[in-house]
Amino acid sequence: MKRSVIENRLQKLFETSPVVVWDDPAGEFADNLADLDLPGATVFVDRDGERFELKALVNGLAATDRLLIYRATPEGAVSPATDTSADWLADVMSYAPIFTADAASTQLADLNALDTPEMRAALKQFAPFFKRASGVKRVHELRASFSTPNELALAVITAALGSDTPATADWTLIAFMACAHEQGSVDAQDKLERAGAWGAFCRMTRDYVGFAGDASKEDELSVHVLMSALHAVAPHGLAERDSGACLARGGDCGALGLESDVPAVLAAEHGAPSPAASEQTARHASEVLRLWLSIAHGAGTVHDALLHAAQTAEHAYGLPAWFGSWPTDALAQIAAFPAVDETLIKRALRALAANERVDENLRTALDQRRTSVWHDRFAATYAALAAALDIEAFGQLSSIDSDARVVWNTYTTSWFRMDAAYRRFRLAFRTARNEVPSLDKDLHRLADHIETRYRCDFLRDSAAAWEHAAEQDLATNGYVADIPRQRDFFITEVEPLLRKTKRTWVIISDALRFEVAAALGEELERTTQGQVHLASMQAGFPSITACGMAALLPHAKLRMTPHVAEPGRNPAGFDVFVDGLPTQGTPARQTVLQTYLDTYHPGMKGVALQSSAFMNMERAERKEAVGAASVVFLYHNRIDAIGDDATTEHDVFDACRDTITELCQLVSQIVREFRASDILITADHGFLYTAQPLGETDKVALTEVQGQIAAYGRRYVVGMRGVSSDAMMPVSLTATSDGELQGLAPREMIRIKKAGGGENYVHGGISLQELCVPVLHFKNFRAGSKGFRDRSYATLSLVSPLTTITNASFELQLLQDDAVGGKVLSATYELGFYLDDGTPATEVRHVAASSAEPDAINRTNWASFHVRAAVMDHVGATCRLVARNVDDPSAEELVLARCTLSISVGTSFSSDW
């Protein structure tokens, strides 16, 4: 420090006290005292034999006198500035300001660190790091003050690694392991050696987590942490019984040179000693792992380092085979190893494929895995399992009333969910097949089972119930009485809106079956300010595009007109007219629409457009295309375009997913640009789809039909009057053809044999999946308007009574307050206990609030917590259980409980680190 700076600082201190003590432990400035320019001040050097004189001088100071006492501390002695217990000048030291100018004192002062021999030794050890001007600043940013060398060491290690994490032992270990994974353990070691911190780091790993190996060797430290934590929770007695066989089937604990760190339960057969880790270091290792898990969600180096360590440990110790012998409830507590997820999934897959009940413990474990760190690695497989469990939960169809309306209403309120679950399963299965190769065989077995459950049980039984109830009406009228009909759509749905809104929007999505529309409604509720009402209507026969599109247009009369058969051409086909006008193609449909408006609403204009063309227009072009139209029909075609093509029919469920996305975008565009308040979304028909090849018993030949055929498809026959078949159901077409035509429909899921491919995706028949057409009414609301309901996230509340925490580990039951659906959105919460000063008292747990169960008892969940060793002895401290919404960081945190820590422990688990 420059002399002028020293003089200036001393003068400022004299302004506050007549006596200033200069503490110079190393005596660096003893030879420079005579050169100081301190007007009016006496400089006295504290030496042995001269303290009586110094004491007298102090006691005789006049009011205007100034005295600088210079004190040097011999090597190894305690500075009087720190310890005044045996100091002749203790009274002076109690009030006189202390001045230091040596480099160590300055650095310690800048760090707000105690000036002790131990701290000076630590500072000397880290001298390479503090040579850089930014060293002190960076370390001080990590911690406000330092009382021990270990605190300083942790901050230096953290800073040297370039980490922004807190400078605590657990965070520092994770920072090193992440750095070692990303840059190599040699580079990570080099960073600490250049900072003079490698020795301190090695001591910390030994003292804190019991690691006696070489941290410079790839993976040793990280695997030690994982295995020490696993050892602490291994089911008692299980490992001693099974470890030898487990390791023989694939374990190689020597591959990492980890014999000394192998948990005793796994090392017994290899003669390796048990780890010397104490209960304290084992607890610390578990805390490190819990912290690692809580911050490893999502991509990133920390996540990748944990994955690499877990997979290395799995291979080295043969863990997948060992986990296979664990009970489910014990496995459910293990979150660090992907092999645990794989084991749980495999158990569920095999139980379902064998038509066995998945026990409650396994269901709970799978449900809790939704927030696990490895969920994304198995996302498609978990999705397939969830859908399969929904299918199994559906059970067998109960006996159904013979009233067709009851069957219809049962389908639109309950049965359609089976179609949705099957669609979700097939979508997930396509991806899951390539997700985890070791699960491929089990997945295919499950897929076979699900196909049987859906096709042979549900579809067959639901079709039988519907046919039994509707057969007479279909044969007599061609439709079921008292169920809304598609041909009345314009009168019942569009006309009322014409009278009260400036413009009515109608979106017709080809083959948008009811269950897909239900999913669309949920997505619209979730992503917009609008609200959705979903109803249904029955399509006409045959349930094909030509008939459905015509029926949705305004009309008084719909007629199916057969083509005149040409020689050698049979069947010849038919056309569909409304009020004498053709309906094939968008221009023809606009003509029908405008003709109706001219007749019944003079002055109104109607527009019909393809949605793809509409969305591809510029904003100004869309405005111009719509103009002053009072009715806009937008035709969307994704599902049918994919399904009707034999080369792409197996992509139809992907098309359903894409349709939901596209229709949401279309609705948002209409609302944003045209301020639409009401939008109707419907379809011309539904569809049937089963993934696996059909057998011969699932088909009927056209030779079973007697009479002249006008047209036919996989699921229908339209013939001239008198056509019949003992293998098919008659469907009257009298009302739509003046008795000229007659319909025939294959029963259940039977397809008509036809040349060419394309038999898995079909429509045209009378099944509920084909006939049940959605009528989705989307109503937009402006914020604050009457009827507006804002979106909100599902919240959590605590079920378990909690006033005092008396155990180091405990479980709490949580309730998801509302079912997810409509405007209630799913959310993931980070839950943790915190002391009043913000210090974490436990690890952070991730809990999902995503249940759509209407019954509150089915929306409960359990979360386990472990009190951190550092706060175990804070008896009487108050803490809060805080829930933070991961999906909405701006949301206010929820305080679910306030309680008191009161843990009685025989052994302290606190650490010098």
Language model region names:
Residues D510:
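Ligand-binding pocket scaffold of soluble enzyme catalytic domains
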Residues M1-T504, R513-I679, A683-W913:
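…; additionally, a secondary subgroup of soluble metalloenzymes is captured
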Residues I507:
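Active-site-adjacent beta-strand anchor residues
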